[in-house]
Amino acid sequence: MTQGLILTKQNKGVSFKTLSRKRFIELELRQNKLGEQTLSERIIHNLNLTNKIIESCAQNGIGHYRLFPSLFPLLMDISLELNLATIKGANQILNLLKKIGATAMEHNVSLSFCPPILTANSSDGLASDNDDSIVKTVRQLDFYAHLFDLMGFPDDYSNSIHVYPHMATKDATQSNLEGIADRFYDGMVRCNDSVIKRLVVMNEKNTCWNCMNLFVYFHQYMGHKHRHIMPLSYDNLHDGANPSALQGKKVTTSQNIDAFAKTWPDNVTPVFHWGNKSNPLSYERPIIWENEKKDFLFPHNKVTPKSAKTVTPKKKATKKTTEPKPSVKKILKKIEKNVLKSTTFNHLYGQ
């Protein structure tokens, strides 16, 4: 089990900087490019802070960090016509992104991301029935996948991007749920390949997308119809608030963890979320458990890199030898076997 860190806004030791659209425009009107200069300085501050957090994770024995959702304020606002490649300080920003990637690989700290536009309460999403919302979502997903590329990471699930289905229905029939999964897939394939190869879906806390439905439609159904094997990310708090039941019996936490873990490629450690003070359940397969921290403090001592056995060379070797096709074929074979012999919900997670 690997401990993963999510920093909350309440953390007094961490202060990421943002910039409102109103303030940006005020600065631009006061002096040409002043708003852009201010924005650039705040992005640079956020990236330096991110690098410091990753170093601190290494010293605290934390092997994973979910990137702060607002590292790049306003860059997703199309009306401002801002571009990462041309913004003031672009070269410094690029170098800092490379530094973050190097620091994470040096200390064997993996990274993930959950875009702010795709939080659980967002009205946007890949399955939206509003094309403008889909365009907005695709733009943001492409941007954050590009950040991982600039950091030097392979385009795979070892640096995952987490989203929710977002589109829900009160009439959770097979037809309606399949329709949402189809729309999600259609939106997803509008993204760059570097998004598709990183995208994972999480169970929701108060919609039709509990663990069971997510597995059946986003993993099994999507794999069978669209030939895309979607990894699923488990959230224990959402599961507790929105449980699954099969034949009148509640599906247990252990069953959900086991099922979701098996949706990930064999050579990638699944990234799940554990949202209470108790320790996550132990599991035969290594799992990264993200957890919010309000009291995370930076150590004063210099971080000592981990041994060479766990640093960049191993990462490179993993990238070169990654062959997802056999795993995909194996899972598809299993899915097709179940589809032929079962009706919806007539089995427990493909068994």
Residue ranges and their predicted role:
Residues 233, 240-241, 269:
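Conserved His + Asp/Glu catalytic blocks
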Residues 1-110, 119-142, 146-157, 180, ...:
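Alpha/beta catalytic barrel-like cores
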Residues 111, 232-235:
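Residue-level marker for buried hydrophobic side chains located in beta-strands
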Residues 168-170, 205-208, 238-241, 279:
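Short, catalytically relevant binding-site loops at active-site mouths
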Residues 160-177:
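Glycine-rich phosphate-binding "P-loop"
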